[in-house]
């Protein structure tokens, strides 16, 4: 059988067996990691404690490859902490600080100033918008008027009370006017004459008794009109009197009735009152002017009175 001659190249394994030389192991390429000179510490940091001063000295290489010396000085302070904080400081460290002694390590911990946190409890603090002071609305408005000098103060606190007061009374007496006649509202109906009261003990018919000819208060036609022009004042002091309310609300219009709630035992004010005006417009101006006004170290609250259900 004919055979074909050809040149065969011996394999690499046959050559190794013939020569008896062990092949070199194939190893992966080695990558050389260059260490940052700034983080390379030449020597172990030296720690010296002198009283309450702690000094740590260490040597490093900077970016230019030069040897530098770093000295850190700490002041040791002893602070009292709660049990929870002391227990937290004894926790086992982990990571790069696993074998560090107690306390912060300058290599892994940065000690800085304390940061104070402010907790916001409501949305009003976020806006920080200054609300308008209700007292600013009353600036320039003449709420109180003195009867003696027409000044912006109470009559009882008038500096001319002892001089002008007697002169005005004497002049009114000379002109035939009384204080009660001056304070009456214009157009007011005169009060009916009272019937004589029997002092002999004889029987008097109801029609001839005092007030027998007058209608009941609930039958008056203008009672509902008074309810529509009645305001309610609250947060009054205990020393408030009807005369004080008269002086306070008289500048706004003619007043038909004032009711001040009082304690039956002490006679002091209970803190609220009802003022009825002849016109509803005057009552509205009184609410706008006196509501929020400071009186006797208290802030008055004035609102419309609810109509009576009786």
Curated annotation (Swiss-Prot):
Residues 211-229 have a biased composition (Basic and acidic residues). CDD domains: eIF3G, RRM_eIF3G_like. One of its GO terms (molecular function) is translation initiation factor activity. Residues 1-32, 179-229 are annotated as: Disordered. It comes from the Eukaryota. Residues 229-307 form the RRM domain. InterPro entries: eIF3_g, eIF3g_N, eIF3G_RRM, Nucleotide-bd_a/b_plait_sf, RBD_domain_sf, RRM_dom. One of its GO terms (biological process) is formation of cytoplasmic translation initiation complex. Pfam families: eIF3g, RRM_1. This is Eukaryotic translation initiation factor 3 subunit G. It comes from Xenopus tropicalis.
